[in-house]
């Protein structure tokens, strides 16, 4: 696990009181007026009960996650869990199929002013993150990207995923390419793609995300189906 990180940085540690898991954390200092600094997990979230890719019954009283190839090794060795959007946002499973706040099965909107899309950038939604932390939002992702002097996104990516690129993990953020699920049939693109949830709806069944790879720069507001399993990073509330 030590190979995932940048040894030139001093990492903190957070113990999730819900299950005792330990996460390395890092204080990023982008220097933005709106986000001068923030503390983030330097690992993908790995909280919840593992379910199989072909699962058809779900329990809204628990956080449920996928592990790549249905193998818990991936969850437990830095790649973390893969979560549907509803699980990542702490919402009922029905919210993967409708706009939040529009049906009795998904009664609570994560942001009542959803028509004003720019206002979603700063949302702090706890979701599957521990109390006092929230799912990393678009403003935080953009601020972190602004710290990348390589201008290609590699400074956010662990050398385990970025290979021998000299700019890899210059921010200490240590992103891994954990792949994703394309429900209902397959896990895809491990070690090729890292896709992270944003608290931002796009359509009834789709949402916006952050995508990174070795081939392209970071893409903000990519569109994925809410049912697809993606990674989550948590940021401490401020």
Language model features with spans:
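Conserved positions within compact, well-structured domain cores
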Residues: 1-238
